[in-house]
Amino acid sequence: MVYLKNYSVILLLLTTLPLLATARNDDWRLVWSDEFNTEGRLSPSVWNYEQGYVRNEEAQWYQPDNAVCKGGFLVIEARKERNRQNPLYIPGSNDWRKEREFIEYTSSSVTTAGKKEFLYGRFEVRARIPVAKGAWPAIWTLGSNMEWPSCGEIDIMEYYQIKGVPHILANAAWGTDKQWGAKWNSKATPYIHFTEKDPEWASKFHIWRMDWDEEVIKLYLDDEL
């Protein structure tokens, strides 16, 4: 659920999710939702597809074909590619986006930047995420009116391995007196915390939620703060 003025939503999931949004007050008024109840690509009036190599020197090439709506779900798929040429390739380049001759993996990253921006309230995502080695699904928001990290970043969900141990994370970042220097507040919960309670955790859908007002940001997974 989203109501975050000057914040846009970025989804880098590798599987399915429906998305809702509510306004901020004690009775929760719905202000926007996307139930992904069409077939094919996402609505261009709401969603953008990131393209190519984007951030963090990651292995995947982002493209629209890997994110489609099917049967009321948004399905985002990571794929292993074979003999696919990187169109940006320049031999001897020092740019990580251009030094790779071949694209080894593709996936999708979709955002609402410039189309849906909100401030305060409740943001809720129902999703099933991949937990295979190498997976890095994420749901996060960025401010839209200045460069990172001064714009702020809220990571409602991330999953990846820390020193070989799978974790689910919730993070917030903001600017410092150094350009590109972020201050982070992070909570990393070992994945085993969830599978000890439910061995079938990975096969089920779960609800990630952010409650945000003028004083505090609270991030939940299945109502657990």
Question: Each predicted region: which residue ranges?
Answer:
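Bacterial N-terminal signal peptides that target proteins for export
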Residues: M1-V9
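Compositionally biased regions
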Residues: V9, T16, S109-V110
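Hydrophobic h-region of N-terminal signal peptides that target proteins for export
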Residues: L13-T22
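GH16 jelly-roll
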Residues: R24-L225
